[in-house]
Amino acid sequence: MTSQGDTTSGTQLKPPVEAVRSHYDKSNEFFKLWLDPSMTYSCAYFERPDMTLEEAQYAKRKLALDKLNLEPGMTLLDIGCGWGSTMRHAVAEYDVNVIGLTLSENQYAHDKAMFDEVDSPRRKEVRIQGWEEFDEPVDRIVSLGAFEHFADGAGDAGFERYDTFFKKFYNLTPDDGRMLLHTITIPDKEEAQELGLTSPMSLLRFIKFILTEIFPGGRLPRISQVDYYSSNAGWKVERYHRIGANYVPTLNAWADALQAHKDEAIALKGQETYDIYMHYLRGCSDLFRDKYTDVCQFTLVK
């Protein structure tokens, strides 16, 4: 198989290393204070309102992995693998080989140590590598909460990077290939009007805060953009599954946990970082509550 569309204007795309590390390499110990024990850092899935965050994160991973029709011995690529919970879940419960890509040095070290504890003969690999640099055949692809970084790049092409992404992985998967893409989305103009959404100054200030203090360079796609670039590469969207309402209790649980560990957080990272992250988590909960943002799981098939 060959990779097509992995250049823009004749230049190899570069992963947004500095932008990603500015957030995810804060400190593993800091994130452990407020994420669930699996350290899953994306929207959970509360099948029942009485679920714990850990149970809801398990449900989210299962929801995503079940959509991939995994079979024992397949190779699953996890793009933006975070602290490895999805890879560990896939090895343990689906008996597959896994390759995880991260740009975070802290996540890489955590995942390497985690794999040493996993009792399975399957291949378990984590790399410090961007999707832009990956070029090996795989059977299935999962990406949970990483697509939001795929258009930031290193000053090149913006949303056109999606074209490269979808074409590359279309060509690296078999004829029955499947991809599960879980990403935050924003409404298009028509949906925003239907929802009665406005753009008050407080919203604009919060967006600026997020792009400055939390996720520099991050960009949120519209569903129509995922449709356009994925279909242009040959993918078909088998299912759109919108689960953004679940991010309200997820973010609230994170904020409550961080607040409960305030003294430890300040000892680790200082008062300013604690205040910034509390503002981030509470403010994002409001965005999902008011439907300025959503989460969609796209099941992509060939």
From Swiss-Prot:
CDD domains: AdoMet_MTases. The keyword Nucleotide-binding does not apply. It is found in: Cytoplasm. The modification N-acetylthreonine is found at T2. One of its GO terms (cellular component) is plasma membrane. Keywords: Acetylation, Cytoplasm, Lipid biosynthesis, Lipid metabolism, Methyltransferase, S-adenosyl-L-methionine, Transferase. It catalyses: a 1-acyl-2-(9Z)-enoyl-sn-glycero-3-phospholipid + S-adenosyl-L-methionine = a 1-acyl-2-(9-cyclopronane)-acyl-sn-glycero-3-phospholipid + S-adenosyl-L-homocysteine + H(+). It comes from the Bacteria. One of its GO terms (molecular function) is cyclopropane-fatty-acyl-phospholipid synthase activity. Disruption phenotype: Inactivation of cmaA2 causes accumulation of unsaturated derivatives of both the methoxy- and ketomycolates. The mycolic acids of the cmaA2 mutant lack trans-cyclopropane rings but are otherwise intact with respect to cyclopropane and methyl branch content. Deletion of cmaA2 has no effect on bacterial loads during mouse infection but causes hypervirulence due to an excessive immune activation which produces more-severe granulomatous pathology than wild-type, and increases both the macrophage activation and the macrophage inflammatory response. Its EC number is 2.1.1.79. GO terms for biological process: Actinobacterium-type cell wall biogenesis; lipid biosynthetic process; methylation; mycolate cell wall layer assembly; mycolic acid biosynthetic process; response to hypoxia; S-adenosylmethionine metabolic process; symbiont-mediated perturbation of host innate immune response. Pathway: Lipid metabolism; mycolic acid biosynthesis. Signal peptide: none annotated. Inhibited by S-adenosyl-N-decyl-aminoethyl (SADAE) and thiacetazone (TAC). Pfam families: CMAS. PANTHER family: CYCLOPROPANE-FATTY-ACYL-PHOSPHOLIPID SYNTHASE (PTHR43667:SF1). Catalyzes the formation of trans cyclopropanated ketomycolate or methoxymycolate through the conversion of a double bond to a cyclopropane ring at the proximal position of an oxygenated mycolic acid via the transfer of a methylene group from S-adenosyl-L-methionine. In the absence of MmaA2, CmaA2 has a non-specific cis-cyclopropanating activity and is able to catalyze the conversion of a double bond to a cis cyclopropane ring at the distal position of an alpha mycolic acid. Homodimer. Was identified as a high-confidence drug target. Belongs to the CFA/CMAS family. This is Cyclopropane mycolic acid synthase 2. It comes from Mycobacterium tuberculosis (strain ATCC 25618 / H37Rv). The gene is cmaA2.
